Amino acid sequence: MAREMTILGSAVLTLLLAGYLAQQYLPLPTPKVIGIDLGTTYCSVGVFFPGTGKVKVIPDENGHISIPSMVSFTDNDVYVGYESVELADSNPQNTIYDAKRFIGKIFTAEELEAEIGRYPFKVLNKNGMVEFSVTSNETITVSPEYVGSRLLLKLKEMAEAYLGMPVANAVISVPAEFDLKQRNSTIEAANLAGLKILRVINEPTAAAMAYGLHKADVFHVLVIDLGGGTLDVSLLNKQGGMFLTRAMSGNNKLGGQDFNQRLLQYLYKQIYQTYGFVPSRKEEIHRLRQAVEMVKLNLTLHQSAQLSVLLTVEEQDRKEPHSSDTELPKDKLSSADDHRVNSGFGRGLSDKKSGESQVLFETEISRKLFDTLNEDLFQKILVPIQQVLKEGHLEKTEIDEVVLVGGSTRIPRIRQVIQEFFGKDPNTSVDPDLAVVTGVAIQAGIDGGSWPLQVSALEIPNKHLQKTNFN
């Protein structure tokens, strides 16, 4: 008997040693489950690699680690992401964006009427649900789920190209405020793209996982997510690996594009006062928007940034420079507000015609000026923060960890406003643009059985949870 036990023990040790050696020296298995962040403005896909425990956010064929959440319909094809951006100026009525705002959501007639005016494409009311009307070879209607499926198909193809194998399973993130219908509609979009969703995870929980908080000894976690067009603030309670969303608040009309818009309006006034005209050509407006976006990005790292844009002057619209009439003409001012979400993308110059001339508009923008133009908007970030603390019955000193998500949280003044409010630095150890997709990829690795084993995030449903919006 003793001999048999010795043999059995030796066999077990041999198997364990073989497993260890296999993990150390055999090729690592390819991830089989992808993690997807289907964002309002940008979306991305990542994988968790067994063995190393590292997350890779997968780039597209041009090296972009996220793609614009934009889909264009033409007579010949459907274009997604950056290809869609290239068509946004010439084909705005058939270029759909912000589909995530509408997916699975039921609107009142008044709510939908307020939304319709914000977009250059046709938004239709189908019994309280949204459909988009687009014209290619014929006029058709497409659902937000279909638009989402085209984005998800692109992300799926990016993952397959990177991994060198078909991908069928995914974990996807959604806003914590999404109800069951919105979550099911997101799953439907994934199914249309050929993906089986193993799990839906809340975006704040995913961000907390990216920061490693599912393994950390913290209880009250505040997630501030400020992207291109929306602000979401979530209060999480974490115990062990379980997360409960205690309170949510936000502003669906506040984000990086609004900060760009303030600088753009300032530049319009400068151009009008200097040259006596306001840019009116779409391609030049978009080039100016592109320059504004680059200035904003540069100002996150530097105290000042240069802006240079070539503009066409139509002499019949020109007034005397430095005239006392410094107010922008209202008909021209509106062009600066059009197609808000398409900011940052431009086209080529038109040829000069008779009665036209070109000027090179150059200026230097300081970080102080940018902050001054947007200070009231920056302060608005604190309103939903105060609201979630109120709903959570907490003092700001009771928050264990403040984590930042979304590209707009890179702005130094925004970080300073948050730091001054809480009296401590927010956690900035993770790239805010990639926090959600990183967390989703970790959860995808867990659901795919990858090793080294991670602590899974268990979300406790909160049926009484409602988001307070300050729009």
Curated annotation (Swiss-Prot):
S-S bridge residues: none
Signal peptide: 1-22
Tissue spec: Constitutively expressed in all tissues.
Main location: other
Localization: Microsome; Endoplasmic reticulum
Keywords: ATP-binding, Endoplasmic reticulum, Microsome, Nucleotide-binding, Signal
A Gene Ontology biological process term: chaperone cofactor-dependent protein refolding
UniProt xrefs under InterPro entries: ATPase_NBD, Heat_shock_70_CS, Hsp_70_fam, HSPA13
Region feature Disordered, mapped onto this chain: 315-352
Function comment: Has peptide-independent ATPase activity.
Protein name: Heat shock 70 kDa protein 13
